[in-house]
C-alpha cells in the first residue's frame, strides 16, 4: 500500500484529497498495483467537521518520521516553510510532488533530478 501525505488543505490540497479519494482504482493501477492511501494531511487549521478528521495533523514531524509515507504532495504554496519541509522530506528519501514554481525555481533549480525526486 502506497501511503501519501498532503501538506496544505486549501483549494489545491482539498482538490488533491478529492482526486485521490475519487480515483483510487486508477491510481492503484498506476502505482504498480499498490493501493494509494492518504495517511496525513498537514494544516495549521482545525477540521473538526471533516469526515476523516483523524488524518489531520499540525505536526510536520508526523510525516517526516513516518517510514510508511513515501510520497508527499506539497500544496502549501509560497517559499517558507514549504522549502524547509520539502528539503527535509527529500533528505529523508521521500518523493515530493508540487506545483509550487517558486519553490522549484528559487530553492531547487540546481538540484539534479536523479537525486531529488521532486516532481512538478
Which residues fall in each region the model found?
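N-terminal glycine-/serine-/threonine-rich beta1-alpha1-beta2 phosphate-ribose binding loop
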Residues: 1-91
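Structured catalytic core of nucleotide-sugar glycosyltransferases
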Residues: 71, 97-100
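Rossmann-fold NAD(P)-binding glycine/threonine-rich loop
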Residues: 82-92, 99-120
Amino acid at each position: 500500500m502506497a501511503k501519501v501525505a498532503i501538506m496544505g488543505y486549501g483549494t489545491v490540497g482539498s482538490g488533491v484529497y478529492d482526486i485521490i479519494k475519487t480515483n483510487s482504482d486508477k491510481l492503484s493501477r498506476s502505482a504498480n498495483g499498490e493501493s494509494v492511501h492518504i495517511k496525513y494531511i498537514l494544516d495549521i487549521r482545525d477540521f473538526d467537521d471533516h469526515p476523516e478528521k483523524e488524518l489531520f495533523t499540525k505536526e510536520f514531524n508526523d510525516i517526516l518520521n513516518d517510514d510508511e509515507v513515501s510520497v508527499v504532495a506539497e500544496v502549501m504554496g509560497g517559499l517558507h516553510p514549504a522549502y524547509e519541509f520539502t528539503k527535509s522530506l527529500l533528505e529523508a528519501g521521500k518523493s515530493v510532488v508540487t506545483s509550487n514554481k517558486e519553490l522549484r525555481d528559487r530553492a531547487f533549480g540546481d538540484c539534479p533530478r536523479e537525486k531529488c525526486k521532486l516532481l512538478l
